[in-house]
Amino acid sequence: MSKKALLMILDGWGLGDQKKDDVIFNTPTPYWDYLMNNYPHSQLQASGENVGLPDGQMGNSEVGHLNIGAGRVVYQDLVKINRACADNSILQNPEIVSAFSYAKENGKSVHFMGLTSNGGVHSSMVHLFKLCDISKEYGIDNTFIHCFMDGRDTDPKSGKGFIEELSAHCEKSAGKIASIIGRYYAMDRDKRWERVKEAYDLLVNGQGKKATDMVQAMQESYDEGVTDEFIKPIVNANCDGTIKEGDVVIFFNYRNDRAKELTVVLTQQDMPEAGMHTIPGLQYYCMTPYDASFKGVHILFDKENVANTLGEYIASKGLNQLHIAETEKYAHVTFFFNGGRETPFDNEDRILVPSPKVATYDLKPEMSAYEVKDKLVDAINENKYDFIVVNFANGDMVGHTGIYEAIEKAVVAVDACVKDVIEAAKAQDYEAIIIADHGNADRALNEDGTPNTAHSLNPVPCVYVTGNKAAKVEDGRLADVAPTILKIMGLEAPADMNGQILIK
């Protein structure tokens, strides 16, 4: 039997420990309580390996909506590369083979550059160590490492320890630390080309403070009051590790935003006014796709094409769908939900409600929830859509402020909106699944009572609003939502979706 389906995503609405830190539990939510008492519900895992992230890593809205829409676990870049390093399949990666074979056959140097820290946001030391090992295996003596120091995703003076770790690994593997510079210069993303020039001059022209002991040079920088992020260019005086014509460069950052500008000046665009010119014949490898417009660069781990998402599949059946959210979460119910696709599918309507223009959302905890609700109720009453997905942003966006009283107000607003939407949906014969993409408002305090502004690792709810009194809903993970929606709609899930159907 086929029904129209409504998928409601309450952003940041996890299932907490029901103690003081759990604002959702501690705030009066009469309609949520009614749903819990009258409809089948279960828990979904929304973090770590269940959503394609490393074990123990909290989920986020981008990853959450990607998994929800895909109907399968979508492995994130970090996990894909970790796996390739662990099972040695990286050795068969055709781009790795081409890079190291070319260097060996042509007597060229190999350069690894990237953020040298264990912050886990832009790069991984594990990947760098593996690259050193591959260089050793190919017998490439001229292997140079250019270290961009962190201090943002790590402690501001942790960099010296990372340089020590890397030096120790190079002793038994391959590679020499040729240069060091702070990410402030090497990883700018705001077109401050004068900063990028500092990194360019270091890498290409060997301009910087000469040092024979790179660990000692880090300590000297600290002694001068300059911490990791802002480390001025340091050159290893014991070797010439500058990047030359025809060399191999592997930029081992897997996150793209702060890897673009340096890539531009080395490979894409001459900037004579800034004294920066691209290097002829450079064999340049990016860990992941940094920018679709880049020409002549190699990509070690290409973007996974997520085909047959929930939105695409519903469109292929000639059905009508609506995606609605306020600005803060609009990209999540469109671009991410549709597998990283910007353009709407056939018969896919979108409603964007502007988020309020306030400095921080504790100043307006209800955000634009009531406006989203009003537009959604109107759309439901049009009786035009076979499938609707909506996101209410409050639990997450107000949760990030860490201000308890504001989060309480956000929860109250969401509860009121859920009521109006679900009652309208029931009246128009929709069945609804209510979930969250990850937790946040369910853990507003740390153990010591200080505000917690981060996402939680808690599971999230899955409520099945149906007229079928015998219905049950099983525990699962976010990847199980799309096949479950299709079941409600009387459609068989495509083979690409390996998530489980949760309703029985």
UniProtKB/Swiss-Prot annotation:
A Pfam family: iPGM_N
Enzyme active site: 61
Role summary: Catalyzes the interconversion of 2-phosphoglycerate and 3-phosphoglycerate.
Binding of Mn(2+) 1, residues: 396, 400, 455
EC category: isomerase
GO MF term set: manganese ion binding; phosphoglycerate mutase activity
Sequence similarity: Belongs to the BPG-independent phosphoglycerate mutase family.
Pathway(s) the chain acts in: Carbohydrate degradation; glycolysis; pyruvate from D-glyceraldehyde 3-phosphate: step 3/5
Catalytic reactions of this protein: (2R)-2-phosphoglycerate = (2R)-3-phosphoglycerate
Positions annotated to bind substrate: 122, 152-153, 183, 189, 255-258, 329
Domain of life: Bacteria
Annotated positions binding Mn(2+) 2: 11, 61, 437-438
Record note on quaternary structure: Monomer.
InterPro entries, per database record: Alkaline_phosphatase_core_sf, BPG-indep_PGM_N, Metalloenzyme, PGAM_B_sf, Pgm_bpd_ind
Alphabetized UniProt keyword annotations: Glycolysis, Isomerase, Manganese, Metal-binding
Protein name as catalogued: 2,3-bisphosphoglycerate-independent phosphoglycerate mutase
GO terms for biological process, alphabetical: carbohydrate metabolic process; glucose catabolic process; glycolytic process
Cofactor: Mn(2+)
Gene designation: gpmI
Endpoints of the signal sequence: none
Record GO cellular component, one term: cytosol
Entry EC no(s): 5.4.2.12
Cofactor note: Binds 2 manganese ions per subunit.
SUPFAM superfamilies in UniProt: 2,3-Bisphosphoglycerate-independent phosphoglycerate mutase, substrate-binding domain (SSF64158), Alkaline phosphatase-like (SSF53649)
